[in-house]
Amino acid sequence: MIEVCPENVRIEESWKKVLYEQFSQDYFVRIKETLLAAKAQGIVTYPPNKLIFNAFDQTPFDAVKAVIIGQDPYHGRGQAMGLSFSVPKGVRPPPSLLNIYKELKRSYPDFQVPDHGDLSAWAKQGVLLLNASLTVEAGKAGSHRAIGWQEFTHAAIEALSNEREHIVFMLWGNFAKAKAQFIDAEKHCILTAVHPSPLAGGAFIGCDHFRRANDYLIAHGKTPINWQV
């Protein structure tokens, strides 16, 4: 069994402090073993190692104003960048993201639908774009859902719930809605809707989450998110 030295985990410093105890847990060791075994066998995983903790690196703990939870990274080549629903510039925006843009256009008529899917601008404003599983095997959706990432992201959500206040949690689809149990609804705003995927029948359009999130932030003395990317 390998060991994980918490000091050597490359993640943004404020998150390292908050999640420090998680890095020595058995489940975290299991994650590292799984990724090392995949590499040894020539199995490709996404995102690249340097982007696994990109959501945390882009949005420090004390900067988080909103959280958008995804299931796991995109499993196609060049898509995953460590931010839920986001793809790098130059990669065609996936259908779920196009529906997110449609809802933004409905809520904010001045919103200009971009020709890219890079949501880094949201992350820099305090939107934690968190996938519940932080890695995936190429071409196999959900393949790393049971290797330990769930425990890690549960810990991150609980830390935000317990140590911060007035954060907007946007939970889309049944998988994300299950995370509500880790969030104190008296301290935070929990918004739920169907998943933005076209497979959900388009019912995501009209949820008004982006406007409601900003209304909540403004009501609690915070700068609203500029959703334009």
Swiss-Prot record:
It catalyses: Hydrolyzes single-stranded DNA or mismatched double-stranded DNA and polynucleotides, releasing free uracil. SMART domains: UDG (SM00986), UreE_C (SM00987). The keyword Kinase does not apply. It comes from the Bacteria. Keywords: Cytoplasm, DNA damage, DNA repair, Hydrolase. HAMAP family: UDG (MF_00148). This is Uracil-DNA glycosylase. The lineage of its organism: Bacteria, Pseudomonadati, Pseudomonadota, Gammaproteobacteria, Cardiobacteriales. The gene is ung.
